[in-house]
């Protein structure tokens, strides 16, 4: 067993970085500690111009950089110094004038930034594939018993602190080694993803005619939390987040109080937050088992999130018990008090949590309180994954949205202005309800949600039952369906309960029959041309 605590000093370091964040300060600290520094190209020039003594790698190896910098560190005096096993390879190193290198600070050519630039072509991308850097990183990581490898600027301070204490422990070097292999794995995966989208039969030099999906799919996720169990107690689980952080989400949220998030908490909170992001005006979404059971939107001058919570809760008070509550505005103390006084809640999430709200919720220590930050108005593109036995389904995120201008009126009666507001509202909610999904809404409040039924008409019946159970009036409400109606029975059922307008994608072979049913009942109906299945 390797001694985890014995400290090894650093006498010689090699520094060659593309991202120069913090490198001057780091090099100065090393110099003050008596560490000899080897460096290359732009890094060497930066150090020299700022008074840091360094030896250029070409002077040390006696071999000048060549091929426009493609070959500069690929030399036995570099890799021998990194890979040489202390106490085993000393004689051969001395024979060839190879000096041991105890620390390697390297980060790689900015391949991702390069290919993200408009008009980037294949030759440009290829020139930004680092060869010497990953080779040094892997060499140092392999020999982590004797060498420290640092690829993240965030580790510089900890390394300096360790050196001032007498050297780096094996535990520190092991952690740095793991980060290094994670770094090169992500880098190579990024290159493979990029190259894997090129259709060689069309044009190997063009970045325009690309497949959306690479030949192999490489993505890196970092473990954020090990959980007590998974969806069920007999399943083990962990929560992994994308290495590169994106917009505000459950993955970026900060937990301010409460018990540790469970597997189901994370899944349900994600559903609630993504739904509430759909709304511009103050909104509240309550979710249970990944389905919205109550949603409401209330303008600021009519009560804002405080009133929105009341209306969302009123949709289905039974299902709201033990649910997840999400807001798209800062959570204030009054709204927080209304929640904790009224119901048992697992998680509350909002872009910001006021101090007053924190003080209120602090009395309920088991309530998980999350602050996720603001999100942009325009949703970021990305990927959704669904694991199947032996495979992975990958699709672009469903960020499709519609406005009133996108609606196609297909019935004799056009919807009123208020009905249009309610139709768009209900449509946004239906997108986040498990298919088959039916949403009844009135005055931008859900009054009944029918979720996850194999028959669309049964989802409609459930929505009506929910509304009746909650004591909410269906007469004059609108109905949203996440997919088309295959038969007229869904419209006939809506007419019986008093639905006044319907929003659906359209596209059924029996659209004419469905439209006729709406006309017979005096129901206004609009098509979106966009489906929102959710499984």
UniProtKB/Swiss-Prot annotation:
InterPro entries: AICAR_Tfase_dup_dom_sf, Cytidine_deaminase-like, MGS-like_dom, MGS-like_dom_sf, PurH-like. Keywords: Hydrolase, Multifunctional enzyme, Purine biosynthesis, Transferase. It catalyses: (6R)-10-formyltetrahydrofolate + 5-amino-1-(5-phospho-beta-D-ribosyl)imidazole-4-carboxamide = 5-formamido-1-(5-phospho-D-ribosyl)imidazole-4-carboxamide + (6S)-5,6,7,8-tetrahydrofolate; IMP + H2O = 5-formamido-1-(5-phospho-D-ribosyl)imidazole-4-carboxamide. GO terms for cellular component: cytosol. Residues 6-151 form the MGS-like domain. It holds the Pfam family AICARFT_IMPCHas. GO terms for molecular function: IMP cyclohydrolase activity; phosphoribosylaminoimidazolecarboxamide formyltransferase activity. Its EC number is 2.1.2.3, 3.5.4.10. It comes from the Bacteria. GO terms for biological process: 'de novo' IMP biosynthetic process. SMART domains: AICARFT_IMPCHas, MGS. Pathway: Purine metabolism; IMP biosynthesis via de novo pathway; 5-formamido-1-(5-phospho-D-ribosyl)imidazole-4-carboxamide from 5-amino-1-(5-phospho-D-ribosyl)imidazole-4-carboxamide (10-formyl THF route): step 1/1; Purine metabolism; IMP biosynthesis via de novo pathway; IMP from 5-formamido-1-(5-phospho-D-ribosyl)imidazole-4-carboxamide: step 1/1. HAMAP family: PurH. Belongs to the PurH family. The IMP cyclohydrolase activity resides in the N-terminal region. This is Bifunctional purine biosynthesis protein PurH. The lineage of its organism: Bacteria, Pseudomonadati, Pseudomonadota, Gammaproteobacteria, Pseudomonadales. The gene is purH.
């Amino acid at each position: 067993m390797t001694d985890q605590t014995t400290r090894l000093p650093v006498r010689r370091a090699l520094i060659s970085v593309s991202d120069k964040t913090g490198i001057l300060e780091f090099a100065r600290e090393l110099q003050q500690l008596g560490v000899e520094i080897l460096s290359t190209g732009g890094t060497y020039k930066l150090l020299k111009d700022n008074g840091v003594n360094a030896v250029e790698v070409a002077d040390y190896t006696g071999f000048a950089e060549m091929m426009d910098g493609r070959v500069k560190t690929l030399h036995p005096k570099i890799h021998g110094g990194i890979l040489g096993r202390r106490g085993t390879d000393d004689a051969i190193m001395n024979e060839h004038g190879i000096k041991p290198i105890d620390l390697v600070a390297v980060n790689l050519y900015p391949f991702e930034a390069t290919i993200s630039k408009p008009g980037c072509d294949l030759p440009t991308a290829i020139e930004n594939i680092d060869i010497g850097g990953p080779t040094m990183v892997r060499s140092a990581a392999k020999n982590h018993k004797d060498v420290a490898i640092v690829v993240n600027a965030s580790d510089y301070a900890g390394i300096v602190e360790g050196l001032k204490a007498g050297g780096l422990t094996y535990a520190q070097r092991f952690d740095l080694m793991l980060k290094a292999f994670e770094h090169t794995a992500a880098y190579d995966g990024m290159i493979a993803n990029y190259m894997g989208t090129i259709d060689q039969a069309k044009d190997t030099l063009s970045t325009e005619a690309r497949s959306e999906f690479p030949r192999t799919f490489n993505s890196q996720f970092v473990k954020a939390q090990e959980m007590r169990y998974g969806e069920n107690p007999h399943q083990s689980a962990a929560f992994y987040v994308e290495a590169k952080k994106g917009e505000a989400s459950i993955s970026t949220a900060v937990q301010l109080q409460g018990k540790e998030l469970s597997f189901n908490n994370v899944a349900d909170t994600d559903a609630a937050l993504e739904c509430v992001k759909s709304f511009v005006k103050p909104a509240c979404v309550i979710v249970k088992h990944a389905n919205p059971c109550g949603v409401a939107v209330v303008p600021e001058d009519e009560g804002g999130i405080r009133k929105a919570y009341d209306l969302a809760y009123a949709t289905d008070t039974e299902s709201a018990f033990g649910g997840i509550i999400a807001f798209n505005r800062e959570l204030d103390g009054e709204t927080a008090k209304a929640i904790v006084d009224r119901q048992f809640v697992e998680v509350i999430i909002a872009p910001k949590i006021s101090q007053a709200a924190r003080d209120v919720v602090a009395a309920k220590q088991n309530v998980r309180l999350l602050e996720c930050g603001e999100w942009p108005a325009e949703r970021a593109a990305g990927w959704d994954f669904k694991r199947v036995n032996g495979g992975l389904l990958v699709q672009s995120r469903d960020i499709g949205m519609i406005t009133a201008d996108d609606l196609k009126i297909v019935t004799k009666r056009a919807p009123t202005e208020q009905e249009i507001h309610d139709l768009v509202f209900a449509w946004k909610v239906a997108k986040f309800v498990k298919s088959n999904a039916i949403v009844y809404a009135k005055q931008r409040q859900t009054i009944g949600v029918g979720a996850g039924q194999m028959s669309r008409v049964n989802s409609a019946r459930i929505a009506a039952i929910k509304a009746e159970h909650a004591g909410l009036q269906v007469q004059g409400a609108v109905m949203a369906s996440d997919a088309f109606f295959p038969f007229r029975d869904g419209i006939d059922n809506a007419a019986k309960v008093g639905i006044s307008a319907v929003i659906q994608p359209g596209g059924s072979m029996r659209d004419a029959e469905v439209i006729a049913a709406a006309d017979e009942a005096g129901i206004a109906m609009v098509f979106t041309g966009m489906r929102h299945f959710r499984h």
